Amino acid sequence: MSSPDGGYASDDQNQGKCSVPIMMTGLGQCQWAEPMTSLGEGKLKSDAGSANSRSKAEARIRRPMNAFMVWAKDERKRLAQQNPDLHNAELSKMLGKSWKSLTLAEKRPFVEEAERLRVQHMQDHPNYKYRPRRRKQVKRMKRAENGFMHMAEAQESAVLGADGRMCLENFSLGYHEQTYPHGQVPQSSHYREPQAVAPHYDGYSLPTPESSPLDLAEADPVFFTSPAQDECQMMPYSYNGSYPHQQNSMLVRQMPQTEQMGQVSPVQGMMACQSSPHMYYGQMYLPGSARHHQLHQAGQPSPPPEAQQMGRADHIQPADMLAEVDRTEFEQYLSYVAKSDLGMHYHAQESVVPTADNGPISSVLSDASTAVYYCNYPSA
């Protein structure tokens, strides 16, 4: 860049300052004499560089002006004087609209002037060839890429945590495992409770389960303790509540009435032991009303069925169960279902029906277990 004074004032200043040591010989040489000479050399170099750039600019041949450029040369100056606060881009837009609004008669003198300049340019530069300058698209593309990268980083920082990792540790809901000593029965509140989710995940919508976790308790062995699995008397989770009448009537019919009146505790033990296969197969083949009730209650978490099971067992007395016994219906379950519907041979109890007169209690139990096993298979 050329200095505003043209380089002349800097030379005069250097001469005046350098003459100070000559006039004041007693004080010695000035401290700033050497730096000023270096600054003067830098200014001379910058002046030489600006002169070279001017020569290069003058060496490049400009294109001849067209009609619009000839008209806008004076019109731009006039608009700039009228609107000094407007930007050059706004002035160019106004000039373009004004030029388009002109008629052909108004444009004719400027078109003729542009043609004269073109002919003059051809005469002055016969070997002229237009070489368009390369636009600096690389820098613009880099700027755009940097902008996109900043936007992407901002979005990633919004999704990721402060340490740059997805915070997925709290999504795995842990359960408190509890152990019970051998011989003790867990209480109704022994089922597991999930840990509370962190408060910053309240905005996420978690999927709603199709069924309650307690309804699938048979498939999960963690819901039972080892003594409860070994002993048949304790079954805290079952589907007995859906069809108590059918199961109780089938199991009570296995005992003769004379022995059932005297032995109440063996009947209860037999009911507890024989309900396991029925609970296993009854889950897949429930009656229509029970299945409808289960589907209706599937979306809601249900309390532990232990309290319901104990409540039903309290008000159901052995006398009420014995009143519902039907001998003929029980014989139908033993003989007819096993032979005709399922197509299986039933040789052991085919000729003798278990009664109170002809057979011990062991034969009755074997017949009942076989009937319950075959009745729960699907009739395919």
Curated annotation (Swiss-Prot):
Residues 329-334 are annotated as: Required for transcriptional activity and interaction with ctnnb1. Residues 264-379 form the Sox C-terminal domain. Induction: Involved in multiple regulatory feedback loops with other endodermal factors, including the nodal-related factors/Xnrs. Autoinduces. Induced by activin. Induced directly by vegt; originally this is in a cell-autonomous fashion but subsequently cell contact is required for expression to be maintained. GO terms for biological process: angiogenesis; cell migration involved in gastrulation; endoderm development; endoderm formation; foregut morphogenesis; heart development; hindgut morphogenesis; midgut development. It is found in: Nucleus. Residues 1-20, 40-59, 292-312 are annotated as: Disordered. Residues 61-129 bind DNA. Keywords: Activator, Developmental protein, DNA-binding, Gastrulation, Nucleus, Transcription, Transcription regulation, Wnt signaling pathway. GO terms for molecular function: beta-catenin binding; DNA-binding transcription activator activity, RNA polymerase II-specific; RNA polymerase II cis-regulatory region sequence-specific DNA binding; sequence-specific DNA binding. This is Transcription factor Sox-17-alpha-A. The lineage of its organism: Eukaryota, Metazoa, Chordata, Craniata, Vertebrata. The gene is sox17a-a.
